[in-house]
Amino acid sequence: MIKSLNERDNFLNRLREMEHKREKDEKQEKAARKVQKFWRGHRVQHNQRLLFRAEFDAVSDRQRGLEETIKMAQLLVNFYETNKDEERLVMTLSELVKLKTSDKEFEKRIRETQRLLLARCCIKFLKNATENTIFFHIFRYLEDYVTCHSKLFEASSKLGLFNAEFHLLEALIGKPTGKTVERASLNPRILQLLTRIFETFVNPSRSTSVSVNVANRLLKTICVNITDLNFSNYILYYIKDHIKPTSPNFTNLFEAMKSVDILNNWKVRPEIAETASLRLQSIFVSQIVHVSNTQSEDVKQYFNSLAVFLEHHSKIMRSLNVKEDLSEFGRLRTSVNNHLKQYCEEMLISNEFRRAACIYANLPGVQVETIISLRKYFSQFLDLLAASNTFVEALYAFIARLCPNGEFDPIDAKSPKVNALELFCNCLNKRVSSVADSDFVPTDIFVDFDHTVEFLRDVSIKLIHLMFPTMARGDLYSGNLKEKMYKAETDWKDVTESVFSILGAIYQKDIRLKYFPEEFWTNHGREVLSGIGEHRRMPRRRMPNGRLQIERTMDTEFVERLAAIYEMDSDSENDDEDEDNNLPAVLRRAICVMKHIPFIVPFMDRVKLFTRLLNQDKEKHYTSTFGMGFNGPSVTVRRDQVYMDAFETFAPKMQGDKVNDLKSMVRVKMVNWAGMNESGIDGGGIFREFLSELLKTAFNVERGFFTFTESKLLYPNPTAPFLLGVDCLAHFQFIGRMIGKLIYERQLQEVRFAEFFIAQIFETDKNKDVDLQHMKSFDPIIFKHLKALQKMNNRELDELQLDFSVVTSDMGLVRNVNLKPNGSKFRVTVENVHEYVRLYVNYHLKQRIASMVDAVRKGISEIISIEWMRMFAPHELQIMIAGYEEVFTAKELRKFCELRFAAGTQDINYEEMFWDVIDKLSNDDKKALLKFVTGCSRAPVDGFKSIQPRMGVLVIPSSDDELPTSATCMNMLRIPKYSNRTKLEEKLRYAINSGAGFELA
């Protein structure tokens, strides 16, 4: 059984082997027949070539006429071989060119198929060319018989005409001797060849209509087959110099560049695709040098195409995954590619691009999408864009069309409408900042200025909500909450900051010009600090030590975080980023508003917030001082020497400086003119009077610290250093401390500062120029002259003989001061008159008082953070220091003042008589009354309701001979119950205007 099975297997194996052998023999036989067939064909062709060649030679040896030349052309295409028949080809082509030259109609005797076959011979010839090859007759034939016909040109391009031509070019250029990537000079032979290759694009007299397909093949040859250095050093610059939008066939070449699909149509490897893309981009952007000299439609077409083209190739570059090639060839290619990238960037920031961009931006029907796509390059000369009414109006129309209500979706962060909004704000900002206050005409800035600013104001709030979105409940427990919050903030940051910037610029101008209605900036219908309340609790989080944070209210967290942000240096704003990310969105929004656009919050809301900041600081100071048993400092001053006695105590000193005491409750003891201590214990009222009298003395222009503008506004006296000597800055620093204490205690002082002075005190940017508009309050005549200067022509300015220097006289010391280095050597002309005006204003309103302003600023900052004042505009800071100039009415005072009778029985008639007397007091008497009762002549900024303790009037039974008295620490007026109205009015006026100390108390 087993034996039979083995025999069966052996039999089957033998059958398989025989089958394999038979198949192998059949394949070998077929291969042999194929080789024999090929060999027989080759022998036949070889013999035929020999016969044709012999016949060709016989014909060519005879007298060559028209028929002989045609016969030679017919024979040549049948036997032509490289390295054997080059001379025969050149001879034939030479004869054909001669005949065409002598007889234009001869061309028709040569069939198109015959011409194309000869063109194929030319292509073979060129592919085998060397640097010594004579190419004249080849190109003459191609020009006269092939490329002059569109159909033949396209057919020959399919056969590899461009590859052959550029092979010859590279043979002429030779192997590079170095690796330098730079423009090379073209010798006459190379220039001639390039001109012949590109003849259909550079020679109008010999141009043939070139299809997009032919142009595509030309571009592929240039971008894929040419060696790196030959393209970057020769071909690129030839194309840049010689091919222009006005050149023949440029339209189809341009269309080919736009429509090229490198990855799908050219089908090249990723590393080749990268190089091809960069070469194509460099050719495309090279046209920038010619665009500005073309027709408007050409400019429009170029820029509209450029935006799409660059975006398309940017996607290609991002999609490629090119591995680094560290070979010598790879390093050279990388170097050339980097050069091409730099070349493209340089072209897109060149003066030529700037000129063309200016033309494009001013064309009617400009495509906003194009400039948005190219905003990286257009933004480099934003002044040109901003100057184009056509573009800016089109940009705003684009925004209004896509988001009429200023609504954006979270996914819109990178959308064209958001980019348009950012660009629009930057353009508008450029316009606003370039216009002096005195030349400000809203409709010149933008045709619909008022509505536009209102739109941006409302959009700013919506953008803040997109920067700090309320996360869904599911996100709160996911692991990527911080990433989502960070992404939202990053995505919307640029456009939001642009909106903030333009709103800030317009607001600063509005502060000075009072253009918008008083409530405009806060009339947005949004509660921007919503959710910040005493009773809303912050979510507790775990501290680094593992313990849970103490429960805090949203309001407390907001105030503390805001104080920390104001104190933070600009370069450390993100030090606490992780902690910020843990804040609720509503808190982050509120902080963002107060940090960037506080002016959209109503003034009184900011006053309340500022009070919270002060109270928090006082609480901290109280904890660190009184908590250790410190009861606050006391000072004794003479009533007629309040300023000097206070200066002796609180002036800046190297040792024993008592500046920190000013953050505590200072108790004052007054000594009267007779040298006796005044009665009364300071519960706050005496200090208020002390501070008021001290500052009144400091601001008295007769003391020399300050002087008046023409509008009777105070600013530091430029001659103070000459009057006060070495102690000058110490006095101003001391005055700054007292102003800081005034603000710290929320006390008011009757004083009107020049806005340019108060703005410099609280300005965070020390390099900011003072606007010419401030000169109007400083000296209207000088303001008028400076305005006139800006409108003069060169002849008028030359007659004035002005230079960049001014003459000053300080206490009899006459000096000539240069407004800039060697200023006396520079004449004022039309070109620099604006610079002269700017420097002149800065010198008089800033430079002359700079050291004193810095001293005042330093003094204030020792008591209260200057940064806290950023939430207020200069005119609001004036209110914070001096209150409102309007005098209170009896009705306002009565609402928050309690009147009682010591006897316990109310006398309605007497009460009404008292309030009627108050109502009839003059404004000066009302101020005197308020100072008599509270120690301050101005009502609080936020009204009498904020006075603590509450104001009161106590009517006591007494005789008509007694005078009213007050307890300023209690804000209480004690008034006898006089027998009649006349007596009441007489005694009250006498008491409040007596100027007495606390002897009446």
UniProtKB/Swiss-Prot annotation:
Q: What is its EC number?
A: 2.3.2.26
Enzyme class (EC, first level)? transferase
Q: Which InterPro entries match?
A: E3A/B/C-like, HECT_dom, Hect_E3_ubiquitin_ligase
Reaction catalysed by this chain? S-ubiquitinyl-[E2 ubiquitin-conjugating enzyme]-L-cysteine + [acceptor protein]-L-lysine = [E2 ubiquitin-conjugating enzyme]-L-cysteine + N(6)-ubiquitinyl-[acceptor protein]-L-lysine
Active-site residues per Swiss-Prot or TrEMBL entry: 969
Any one GO molecular function term: ubiquitin protein ligase activity
- Signal sequence bounds: none
Coiled-coil residue spans: 66-115
Under the heading SUPFAM superfamilies, the entry gives: Hect, E3 ligase catalytic domain (SSF56204)
Q: Does the keyword Disulfide bond apply?
A: no
Q: Which UniProt keywords apply?
A: Coiled coil, Meiosis, Transferase, Ubl conjugation pathway
Q: How does it assemble?
A: Interacts with ify-1 and cyb-1.
Q: What is this protein called?
A: E3 ubiquitin-protein ligase etc-1
Q: Which gene encodes it?
A: etc-1
